[in-house]
Every structure is written in C-alpha cells, then in structure tokens.
Amino acid sequence: MLRSGVIAKKVGMTRLFMEDGKQIPVTVLQLDKLQVVAKKTSDSDGYSAVQLGAGTAKAKRTSAPMRGVFAKASVEPKRKLVEFRVDADNLIEVGEEIIADHYFEGQFVDVTGTSIGKGFQGAMKRHNFGGLRASHGVSISHRSHGSTGQCQDPGRVFKGKKMAGHMGAARVTTQNLQIVRTDTDRGLIMIKGAVPGSKGGWVTVKDAVKKPFPENAILPAALASAAAEAAKQAEEAAAAAAAEAEAEAARLAEEQAAAEAESLAQAEAEIAAEGSDAAPEGDADKKDGE
C-alpha cells in the first residue's frame, strides 16, 4: 500500500517528558503549507504519483514556467517540491493541504534528508578507522589510514577504497524512526531521535518500508479540508445536542411547574374543604353556651 509522504522542515531537537517520568529526545519537524501541486496518473503519465510543495517562495524569484505550474494548481509559489509515488486509489486532488495528522503516535517512518557537510575529513572520522599506534615506531602517521592495497600486482588502488575525502552533504535515509507526538494546530511532528540534516533543512517523511503498513493509517492522506468538515460536523452535532438538552430542560421545568401548580391547587382545595367542615361545629358550640 503506497500513500503519499510529507515534506517537512527540521526545526531542531528537544525532549519530551512522558507520563511515567521518562524523557525522550525528539526532533521537531514542521509542515509549512504542504499542498498538492500536481498529480500523475497512469493514463496520462504512465505511473501514479503526487507532487507536493511546501514553504512559500517569492514570485519574483520563481521562474516563469514554475509560476505557470503554481497558477494552474491555484497555489502560491512553493520553496520545495517533491514527488511521491502512490497507488492509483491514493491520489489526492490538486490544491489539497496535508496536515500533521497524516501520521499517528507510535508509527514508524523513514526520514530522508541531506546530512550536515563536514568538509574534507580523514579516514578515522570519515570511516571510523582505528588509526595507527601511538608509539612503537609510529611517527607522524598516527591518524593515517595505513595501507591502501597490495604490491605490483594489481599495482593500483581498487575503486571504492575507504580513504580520506569529502564527508557529509549527502542524501541520507534513516529508517524505522518512531513518531512520539503530533500537533495539528501548529503543524508539528515530533520524531524520536535524530534525523539527517541541519536546522532549517528540508526532509521527507514516508511510511516505514520495513514495517507492516499500519491499519489505522489515513487514506489517501490527512487533509485539512476533511479535518475542517469533521470539525464543522462536530460543532453542528454539539449545537444540536445543546439545543436538545435545552429543550429537555425546558420540558422538565414545565412539567415541574405544572406539578407544583397542581399540588398547590390540591392543597388549597383541601384547606377550603377543612374550613367548610369546621364552620358548623363552631356555630353549634356557640348555641350550647347560650
């Protein structure tokens, strides 16, 4: 089951305290106006995919062809564009916005980004080599990589040999990271541990390929329009429930008032009856006294 991933901006790292008192280091990712810019179908393009755009770019710094693409999609110019392959059933309409509820707490994801550049580094830092001995005849070459091959045969260094060179600034994917918390109102996704890239860098988040597809995942995606519709329905349901409760309270008040009025009338009738019965007895006593 293939569904769309998301484009997020790396805000930084912090920690969260759980209910049991444990603290978990998390990386905070932010969804910045993540919208569908285009979609590819099997009929027109030969495959199914959605193109997402995130961030906001100045129109004057956007090329004319890209301005046409954004205008066709009726979205503002985006800073980052990424295409995600999806199943035909999980295509999303152009212009829809994806929110942080796309993932849920406890779900495993794969995060891809550009690692922090380290420049030219030696073999010990770049490949975790142990280096040479600190003494016993080793001079100057303590942090060198040592031998790079054989002798006259083959007479060359094999391609791909681990040596000193440029480190970092490469596309890296970290797999099976766990979602700790999401914040839809602020568009935040908090992932346990570190993710590739520096602060302010763009990363892509996808469902983990080495884990079973979660049964409670939202298909085709968690959309802002669907959330707004659900909130509207919930508000209408709450208003209807409040009106029903108010009507029920009014009915109960009317019944109570009617019951009180009936009991009052019954009490007045009993008092009147007692008064009418007591009047003749008083007159008889008066005559006996005379």
From Swiss-Prot:
Cellular component terms (Gene Ontology): cytosolic large ribosomal subunit
SUPFAM superfamilies: Translation proteins (SSF50447)
Positions of modified residues (N5-methylglutamine): Q152
Keyword Ribonucleoprotein recorded: yes
First and last residue of the signal peptide: none
GO biological process, alphabetically ordered: translation
Protein's UniProt keywords contain GTP-binding: no
One Pfam family hit: Ribosomal_L3
Single annotated GO MF: structural constituent of ribosome
Assigned keywords, A-Z: Methylation, Ribonucleoprotein, Ribosomal protein, RNA-binding, rRNA-binding
Region (Disordered): 250-290
Post-translational modification: Methylated by PrmB.
Highest taxon, organism lineage: Bacteria
Biased composition (Low complexity): 255-274
Protein family according to the UniProt entry: Belongs to the universal ribosomal protein uL3 family.
Oligomeric and partner information: Part of the 50S ribosomal subunit. Forms a cluster with proteins L14 and L19.
Described purpose of this protein according to its UniProt entry: One of the primary rRNA binding proteins, it binds directly near the 3'-end of the 23S rRNA, where it nucleates assembly of the 50S subunit.
Family matches, as NCBIfam families: L3_bact
Protein name (record): Large ribosomal subunit protein uL3
Gene: rplC
